[in-house]
Amino acid sequence: MNVVVVGAGMAGTMLAIRLARRGHRVDVVERRGDPRGMNAPEAPSISIGLSERGRAALRDIGLLEKALATAVPMRGRIVHRSGRASYQPYGTDDTEVLHSVRRHDLNIALLDAAASVPRVRLWFGHRVTGLAGTEVRTPARTFSADLVVGADGAYSTVRTHLHRRVRAEFHRTYLDWGYQEFTIPAVDRPEALHVWPGRRGLVVAHPNADGSLTGTVFLPFDGDTGFSGLRDPARAGAFLAEEFGDLTDLVPDLVPQFLAHEPGSLVSVRTAPWQHDRVVLVGDAAHAVFPFYGQGMNAAFEDCAVLDACLAEHTPDDALAAFEARRRPHTDVLAELSARNFVELRDRVRSPVFLARKRIDFTLGRLVPGWRTLYAMISHSSLPYGDALARAHRQHRLLGGFVGLGGVTLLAAARRKRSGRC
């Protein structure tokens, strides 16, 4: 089968490798230039979290070891507030970790791996201008295929052309907050996600292999304490110092970095159907989500594994319908979880009641066989997102009883167990 994959990002390259290894011929069409070239622009230092779903996909194609070689394990989050830092572990043992990876480095590794597969051809600088059936048109050439995959991101061209053929539902939602990235020099305890929850903003920072952190500040776009109201250096400096405390001590040039670029937008995409007449969407083209659960790339990798399996099990036409049926309900759940986690990171990590509930949930995960936190099911397993949420709801109904009837006693017993006392 001849396959054209539009987009040479994470999902496109991952899928190309998988399909080519099954014997399909794959052309990957990318509008940008080759990022591996000598004249490629310098890549931004974006770091992202690699969870078990993403690790499983990389393991399948033999790239996990290479990806982890420059990754930094994140065993929990460190929350900074009022000059103090508290540690919240992600899992119950050393296997339940996330890994911070540089997006650019991982994309290069995937491109190199795709280029090494004889049945894959990479076409850079080819912008898709039309789609007729399974014929993909660019100004330079036309690609004929048996299957077209749109892996071209939240602003997908393939999706636009697909929607001209079929009655489609489409929802693009922008958060009224934006983001700006900056670099934090080396800090203590780098093997964690660092969070500064302010009253009017949020900073999240991923660790890098050199000991530094890649920070992201999230603020409203508008208002006196939003990006639009903080363009003056003195005003921005005063706000950042008041809102995020010790962060300004860690980053002497925080204000210049904060003002260096325009803030980016945060977008979520939902659409249906994902497929029609041998054209299918994967990754952000099908289900872009807000970044606050750290699952965008991981979900895209999982899409590739599921689509690959469906194509192996069914005829191409049936495979695409089976893929959408298996994935779309769960990525809809992920979109809800990602939006919800924004509220948790921004507001609830400061709440004593919320933190107590989290501690009880975490302790039950250590003491009660079969009990897993929602975060653990999402980040440390491959349980479908919807199944994980349903299981968490069942547990939380029980947890309400624990909180009312003995949560404090349970925590005290757990502390005694850890300290070796009876």
Cite the ranges covered by each PLM segment:
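Extreme N-terminal starter segment of soluble prokaryotic enzymes
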Residues: 1-4
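Conserved mid-domain beta->alpha element of the FAD-binding
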Residues: 8-21, 150, 182, 260-340, ...
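Conserved Rossmann-like nucleotide-cofactor binding loop
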Residues: 11, 34, 155
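Glycine-rich FAD pyrophosphate-binding loop
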Residues: 20-43
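Conserved N-terminal helical subregion
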Residues: 51-181, 233
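Acidic/histidine metal-binding catalytic segments
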Residues: 69-72, 121, 242-259, 315-322, ...
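Conserved FAD-binding catalytic core of PHBH/FMO-like flavoproteins
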Residues: 112, 126-129, 135-262, 266, ...
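C-terminal helical "tail/cap" subdomain of flavin- and related membrane-associated enzymes
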Residues: 309-422
